Amino acid sequence: MIVLGLTGSIGLGKSTTAKMFAEAGVPVHDSDEAVHRLYSGVAAPLVEAAFPGTVVDGVVDRAKLGARVLGDAAALKRLEAIIHPLVRADADAFLARHRTAGESIAVLDIPLLFETGGRGRVDKVVVVTAPAEVQRQRVLARPGMTEEKLAAILAKQVPDEEKRRLADFIIDTGQGLEAARAEVDAIIDELRGQRGS
């Protein structure tokens, strides 16, 4: 089974692209969704122990947790030390299930693939991109988003240009949904061809 890492900076269309892979029948593990699930499950007591008062009714309150780690590099590192191994274990279980089921390709949707050392876990990398102004417009249209928040997020991410340089495949969502879907289909066809499936 070929493990495809899907990544891209905020606002570039990674989530939309992940849905396109799923709609084409490729299993997709969404790291962000896994975090949400873990926050209401096994991660909750671990997060509460590290950040008292951030769990309400057995579920991590993301706003309270965010207030505790935002701008505090040491706190963020503590949180990542709790969450990243759990997400990785969740992804490993996902891959094992789909490998056993005989899938030819599976996608790990990892927003911070390069930043968290995830490159070594995948066979190929797809980077989703779009022009910087398109990214800015998309992100600033989100509720509660500001120029300052966007700048802070981008400062923690590998620049888009560098991600594109490291990619095996690039999908430009700035060209529209149909063009992006055609690129997804072409990648799937190429990878299935490599496996002889």
From Swiss-Prot:
Listed EC numbers: 2.7.1.24
Residues bound to ATP: G11, L12, G13, K14, S15, T16
Assigned keywords, A-Z: ATP-binding, Coenzyme A biosynthesis, Cytoplasm, Kinase, Nucleotide-binding, Transferase
Keyword Lyase: no
Catalytic activity: 3'-dephospho-CoA + ATP = ADP + CoA + H(+)
GO biological process assignments: coenzyme A biosynthetic process
ATP-binding in keyword set: yes
Pathway this chain belongs to: Cofactor biosynthesis; coenzyme A biosynthesis; CoA from (R)-pantothenate: step 5/5
GO molecular function, one term: dephospho-CoA kinase activity
Transmembrane segments: none
Domain DPCK, residue spans: 3-197
Recorded GO CC terms: cytoplasm
Localization per Swiss-Prot or TrEMBL: Cytoplasm
Entries under NCBIfam families matching the protein: dephospho-CoA kinase
HAMAP family in the cross-refs: Dephospho_CoA_kinase
Protein family according to the UniProt entry: Belongs to the CoaE family.
PANTHER family per UniProt: BIFUNCTIONAL COENZYME A SYNTHASE-RELATED, DEPHOSPHO-COA KINASE-RELATED
Function: Catalyzes the phosphorylation of the 3'-hydroxyl group of dephosphocoenzyme A to form coenzyme A.
Protein name per the record: Dephospho-CoA kinase
Species this chain originates from: Mesorhizobium japonicum (strain LMG 29417 / CECT 9101 / MAFF 303099) (Mesorhizobium loti (strain MAFF 303099))
Organism ancestry: Bacteria, Pseudomonadati, Pseudomonadota, Alphaproteobacteria, Hyphomicrobiales
